[in-house]
Swiss-Prot record:
Organism taxonomic ancestry: Bacteria, Pseudomonadati, Pseudomonadota, Betaproteobacteria, Burkholderiales
Stored SUPFAM superfamilies: LDH C-terminal domain-like, NAD(P)-binding Rossmann-fold domains
Amino acids binding substrate: 95, 101, 134, 165
Keyword Zinc: no
Record's protein name: Malate dehydrogenase
Gene3D superfamilies: Lactate dehydrogenase/glycoside hydrolase, family 4, C-terminal, NAD(P)-binding Rossmann-like Domain
PANTHER family on file: MALATE DEHYDROGENASE
Family: Belongs to the LDH/MDH superfamily. MDH type 2 family.
Residues at the active site: 190 (proton acceptor)
Length: 329
């Protein structure tokens, strides 16, 4: 028997990431090749954005995707999020010229408070929320705190792009395919303070750390390359990474819904206190997923260097959280 369609909301739907994302969702890349989807697309309430969204929907229609059971355009989160099973919160206020990080946090806090409240009011009680729009961890924290009637575990932030970037750097360094690499993780914030960690990773079952055996490369090349990759892409292309971000969002949600078969992935999730990360902090952890639930990989040894890096990214997240506290009161 055919499956009932799942409702997927995407915000910032006419933006660059949205444009790279929507066609792949409609094609079945997000939820599987036998799962029909209904797209509920949100854009800001101005004529230019809504017209752009109409154009995107015309293109989606013109693809005649067999799995697409419906698509609608919205300017109000209360209609866009009605009964949704998955919400991809892509739209966020970008940092403008002369804007301090504090201003950026405040501008986004307003957006994600409204969206969190709307999800709380009208989304499915099992909705899975992924925040892509930056600063992703803190935006996800704000949305979660604005939705007290939904389980906190339903809210996640995207660190999969950092995870995939780290994978590709290790594959290039070792000359092995990305599929051979397992047990990699990225700790912390989706920002240059993140900590990509291959101490436990394996290639074809053998230790990556031993295969690379180069601590100087780890500290001076690998960590900064992954941490500053977004900036390097802006420098080269003139615009921020969109297709790779959309791809990471699809990886994140697909693995969350369909399971990882015991493989580790990285998700930004509300901490349960593991590894000394304060409860509710939206933090990148190694996880495995099964039956639509994620579980933090436990029992990993945190050496002195790793602890230092984790403390650094945690400090930044705590400062961001402090910076928006008054807006959540």
């Amino acid at each position: 028997m055919a499956k009932a369609p799942m409702r997927v909301a995407v915000t910032g739907a006419a933006g660059q990431i949205g444009y790279s994302l929507l066609f792949r969702i409609a094609n079945g890349d997000l939820l599987g090749k036998d799962q029909p989807v209904i797209l509920q697309l949100l854009e800001i309430d101005n004529e230019k954005a809504q017209n752009a969204l109409k154009g995107v929907i015309m293109e989606i229609d013109d693809c005649a995707f067999p799995l697409l059971a419906g698509v609608s355009a919205h300017s109000d989160p209360m209609t866009a999020f009605k009964d949704v099973d998955i919400a991809l919160l892509v739209g966020a206020r970008p940092r403008g010229p002369g804007m301090e990080r504090k201003d950026l946090l405040e501008a986004n806090a307003q957006i994600f408070t409204v969206q969190g409240k709307a999800l709380d009011a009208v989304a499915s009680r099992n909705v899975k929320v992924l925040v892509v729009g930056n600063p992703a961890n803190t935006n996800a924290y704000i949305a979660m705190k604005s939705a007290p009637n939904l389980p906190a575990k339903n809210f996640t932030a995207m660190l999969r792009l950092d995870h995939n970037r780290a994978l590709s750097q290790i594959a290039a360094k070792t000359g092995k395919p990305v599929t051979a690499i397992e047990k990699l993780t990225v700790w912390g914030n989706h920002s240059p303070t993140m900590y990509p960690d291959y101490r436990f990773a394996t290639i074809d079952g053998k230790s990556v750390k031993e295969a690379i055996n180069d601590e100087v490369w780890n500290k001076d090349v690998f960590l900064p390359t992954v941490g500053k990759r977004g900036a390097a892409i802006i420098e080269a292309r003139g615009v921020s990474s969109a297709a790779s971000a959309a791809n990471a969002a699809i990886d994140h949600v697909r693995d969350w819904v369909l399971g990882t078969n015991g493989k580790w992935v990285t998700m930004g999730i509300p901490s349960d206190g593991s590894y000394g990360i304060p409860k509710d902090t939206m933090f990148g952890f190694p996880v495995t997923t099964e039956n639509g639930e994620y579980k933090i990989v436990q029992g990993l040894e945190i050496d002195a260097f790793s602890q230092e890096r984790i403390n650094l990214t945690l400090k930044e997240l705590s400062e961001e959280r402090e910076g928006v506290k008054h807006l959540l009161a």
